[in-house]
A protein has these predicted regions:
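Phosphate- and other anionic-substrate recognition elements at nucleic-acid/protein interfaces
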Residues: 1-180
Length: 180
């Protein structure tokens, strides 16, 4: 089972979605909303890959500066805990993950919802996602999938750039000769 977790941080609660990526389609295994402290505990004990949506200051009005600061504390805290505990993670802004996954950085919440409902299987035993949480849970799902796409692209590029054994031996004959 390949576990993938996405976090949509908020000023009061953080949306978290866990997906299984081992099938043909991603499957939502669980979702929840956590406080900043609960999120830190969750991240410290997780295995798999974590994708965190980072805050874009231009997306907030100056009236909500306190909310912006609290949201950034949650995102930065999750990143710090992941780093300290050796959890593989990727941080993406809302525009980055929407652009990476949907090829449209300013995709609407409705477009995100439609893309997720078409792409992701939902475990039948999951509780219903109510309207108040839906946008944030769907953002957590979206950032998780986009985070994995970014990492896969980086790994594919690295593999493409890595020389084959024959090319390496031809380029470095002294380093690859056995001792006599």
């Amino acid at each position: 089972m390949t576990l993938l977790c996405g976090v949509d941080p908020g000023s009061r609660t953080n949306a978290v979605a866990t997906l299984d990526m081992s099938g043909k389609r991603p499957c939502l295994l669980s979702w929840c909303t956590l406080t900043r402290e609960e999120l830190a505990t969750f991240v410290s004990g997780m295995s798999g890959f974590l994708a965190i949506e980072m805050v874009e200051g231009v997306a907030f009005d100056s009236v909500r500066a306190a909310d912006l600061i609290q949201t950034q504390r949650a995102a930065g805290g999750a990143e710090c805990v992941a780093h300290v505990n050796g959890v593989r993670y990727e941080c993406l802004s809302g525009r980055d993950w929407r652009g990476e996954w949907l090829r449209f950085p300013t995709a609407s919440d409705k477009a995100i919802r439609v893309a997720i409902e078409v792409t992701v299987d939902f475990d039948a035993d999951l509780p219903r996602i109510y309207h108040d949480d839906r946008k944030h849970i769907y953002d957590a799902i979206g950032v998780a999938i986009a985070g994995l796409v970014v990492v896969e692209l980086i790994l594919a590029f690295a593999a493409w750039r890595m020389p084959s054994n024959e090319e390496f031996v031809a380029a470095h004959p002294v380093a690859t000769q056995g001792s006599a």
